[in-house]
C-alpha cells in the first residue's frame, strides 16, 4: 500500500532530514539499517504530523500527530552516537532515531527546528468552513425534535439512559436531555469547573457509547444526508467514528475549543457565559435546545 493510500496527504512540508529509526528491544535500542527520512508536515486538517519514511521505497511508515507542548525531540545523552528521541508527555510513547545527515555539526540546529515546528500554534485553514458547517447543523437541529439532539450527546452508562428515554412512544423530552447531560458532567448542568477541562469530545464519541443510540434513536436517518450514498448503516457510522481522519478532526476541535482559538459566537454561544471546555460547550448546546423548545411552545 502506498503512503498516499495509508496516510493523509500533507498540505505543507515544513522540515525534512535524513535519519533512521530505532526499536527498543528489552533494555537495548537497536538501529534499523534502512535509509530513512524524518518529515515534519502540516496535514489538510491543520494538524502537525511527525513522519518517518523509508527513503528507498519513498513510503511513510510512521505517522504521529503532535499537538503543541505534547512532545519533545532531544539528543540521548547516554549514547555517544547521534541518537535522538521523540518522547511524549501525554503518554509513554518514546520513538528513537539515529541521524544519517553527513554533518554532525548540524544536528543541534535540526533538533531545535523540530521542536520549533512541533510546538508552534496550530492553524486551521478550513476553520471558517468547519464553523459554518457546524453552525448550519445546529440550526437544523433546532428545527428537529429533541431526540435527534440527544443522539449527539453520549455518556457513560448510556444503555440504561436510552432505555428510559425511549420507553415512551413520543420524542425525547427536554428533561431527558438534561438528565443525560447531568450524568455527563457528573453533577447538575451549569456547574462546570476546571475539573471538566480533561473531558475531550473523543471521550464521548466512542463506538461502544454510540451504538446504543444507533439502536434506540433515529440517529441513522439524521446522519444519512452527511454520509456517502449506501454507507448509512450502523456499521458504516461506527467505522467512520474509528477512522483516523474523523478522530483527528475531533481532536482538533477539542484543542481549539480548550485553547480559546475558536469564536463561540459563530455557534450562537455567548462566550461570557461559558468556559472553553467540552463540558461547557455541551452545556451551551443544551441551553440552546432549552431556549428553542420554549420558543416553539410559545409559538404553538
UniProtKB/Swiss-Prot annotation:
> Which part of the chain is the DEUBAD domain?
192-295
Q: What is its main location?
A: cytoplasm
The membrane-spanning stretches of this chain are none
* Compartments (UniProt record): Cytoplasm; Nucleus
Q: Which GO terms describe its cellular component?
A: cytoplasm; nucleus; proteasome complex
Q: In UniProt terms, what is the effect of altering residue 88 to R?
A: Abolishes interaction with 'Lys-63'-linked polyubiquitin chains and interaction with DSK2A
- Gene disruption: observed consequences: No visible phenotype.
**UniProt keyword Membrane, yes or no:** no
Tell me which UniProt keywords the record has, alphabetically.
Answer: Cytoplasm, Nucleus, Proteasome
Tell me what effect the entry lists for residue 47 to A. Abolishes interaction with 'Lys-63'-linked polyubiquitin chains
Which stretches are annotated as coiled coil? Answer: none
Domain Pru, chain residue ranges per copy: 9-121
Q: Which CDD domains match?
A: PH_Rpn13
Q: Please list the residue ranges annotated as the PH domain.
A: 13-120
Phenotype when changing residue 67 to R: Abolishes interaction with 'Lys-63'-linked polyubiquitin chains and interaction with DSK2A
Identify the domain of life: Eukaryota
Q: How does it assemble?
A: Interacts with 'Lys-63'-linked polyubiquitin chains. Interacts with DSK2a.
What's the entry's take on its domains?
A: The PH domain mediates interactions with ubiquitin and DSK2A.
**Assigned protein family:** Belongs to the RPN13 family.
Q: What the protein does?
A: Functions as a proteasomal ubiquitin receptor. Binds and presumably selects ubiquitin-conjugates for destruction. Prefers multiubiquitin chains rather than single ubiquitins, with a binding affinity for 'Lys-63'-linked ubiquitin chains.
State the name under which the record lists this protein.
26S proteasome regulatory subunit RPN13
Tell me the organism's taxonomic lineage. Eukaryota, Viridiplantae, Streptophyta, Embryophyta, Tracheophyta
Question: What gene is this protein a product of?
Answer: RPN13
Amino acid at each position: 500500500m502506498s503512503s498516499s493510500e495509508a496516510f493523509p496527504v500533507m498540505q505543507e512540508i515544513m522540515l525534512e532530514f535524513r535519519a533512521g529509526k530505532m526499536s527498543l528491544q528489552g533494555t537495548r535500542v537497536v538501529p534499523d539499517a534502512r535509509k530513512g527520512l524524518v518529515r515534519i508536515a502540516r496535514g489538510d486538517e491543520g494538524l502537525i504530523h511527525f513522519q518517518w519514511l523509508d527513503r528507498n521505497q519513498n513510503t511513510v511508515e510512521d505517522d504521529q500527530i503532535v499537538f503543541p507542548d505534547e512532545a519533545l525531540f532531544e539528543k540521548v545523552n547516554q549514547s555517544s552516537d547521534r541518537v535522538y528521541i521523540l518522547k511524549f508527555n501525554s503518554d509513554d510513547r518514546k520513538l528513537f532515531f539515529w541521524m544519517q545527515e553527513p554533518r554532525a555539526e548540524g544536528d543541534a540546529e535540526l533538533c531545535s527546528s523540530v521542536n520549533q515546528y512541533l510546538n508552534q500554534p496550530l492553524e486551521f485553514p478550513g476553520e471558517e468552513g468547519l464553523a459554518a458547517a457546524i453552525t448550519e447543523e445546529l440550526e437544523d437541529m433546532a428545527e428537529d425534535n429533541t431526540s435527534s439532539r440527544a443522539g449527539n450527546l453520549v455518556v457513560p452508562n448510556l444503555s440504561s439512559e436510552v432505555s428510559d428515554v425511549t420507553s415512551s412512544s413520543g420524542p425525547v423530552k427536554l428533561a431527558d436531555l438534561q438528565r443525560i447531560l447531568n450524568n455527563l458532567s457528573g453533577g447538575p448542568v451549569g456547574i462546570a469547573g476546571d475539573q471538566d477541562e480533561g473531558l475531550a469530545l473523543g471521550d464521548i464519541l466512542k463506538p461502544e457509547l454510540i451504538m446504543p443510540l444507533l439502536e434506540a434513536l433515529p440517529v441513522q436517518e439524521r446522519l444519512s444526508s452527511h454520509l456517502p450514498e449506501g454507507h448509512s448503516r450502523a456499521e458504516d457510522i461506527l467505522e467512520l467514528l474509528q477512522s483516523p481522519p474523523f478522530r483527528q478532526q475531533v481532536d482538533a476541535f477539542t484543542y481549539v475549543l480548550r485553547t480559546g482559538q475558536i469564536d463561540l459566537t459563530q455557534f450562537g454561544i455567548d462566550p461570557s457565559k461559558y468556559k472553553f471546555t467540552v463540558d461547557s460547550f455541551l452545556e451551551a448546546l443544551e441551553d440552546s435546545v432549552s431556549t428553542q423548545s420554549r420558543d416553539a411552545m410559545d409559538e404553538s
